[in-house]
Amino acid sequence: VRDASYIAANMRAEDFREIACLWKHWDTRALGVCAVETAVPGMAWSVWYDGQPAAAFGFSRASAFDPEHWQAWAFGTDRFRRCVPQLTRHVLGFRSRIERDCRRLQVITLKDHDIAHRWIEALGARREGLLRSYGRGGEDFWIYAWVRRHAVTETTGCPGASGQDGRKASWE
């Protein structure tokens, strides 16, 4: 919580514009607590650069009733860009767990945050649509997602998650 709160208090302008517009009352400490406390167990991290916390990122449950539906999040200080290679390697290192435990991983991002869009797309997410007036001030956001394709079971005709019906699911 300490790292995430520090990063939130020293957040770069792009991330502040993207995140603060979602809050009725902006609070950097509350963001740090929310980021860590709502994370999927073991799925919240911070990256330090030059002796200070510089980036926070992770996955939270996007739905209270669907443990396989996750929301990705990341924010950082002005040194965030220097952390992107390490963030990317770290996330890719968890790919097998993400593919196993998560049916849908989504991320929302401010419509004009084009640097974030390029990184998200490079990681393989697909842009699904525009969330009009998603921000409290009328800001539009894009929603991106990675979605696990389920194999259909022969006996029930219902989708089965990877490992539940003996078939391997893939991501798109």
What feature does the model see in each segment?
Residues 57-66, 131:
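A conserved beta-strand-loop-helix scaffold within acyl/acetyltransferase catalytic domains
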Residues 83-97, 118, 122:
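Conserved acetyl-CoA-binding loop-helix of GNAT-fold acetyltransferases
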Residues 105-121, 126, 134-135:
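Conserved beta-strand-loop-alpha-helix junction that forms the acyl-donor binding cleft
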Residues 133-172:
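C-terminal "cap" of GNAT-fold acetyltransferases
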Residues 51-56, 67-70, 139:
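Glycine-rich phosphate/pyrophosphate-binding loop shared by adenosine-nucleotide-utilizing enzymes
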Residues 1-29:
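Short amphipathic alpha-helix that is part of the acyltransferase structural core
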Residues 67-81, 86-87, 142:
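Conserved acetyl-CoA binding element of GNAT-fold acetyltransferases
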Residues 41-60:
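Conserved beta-hairpin
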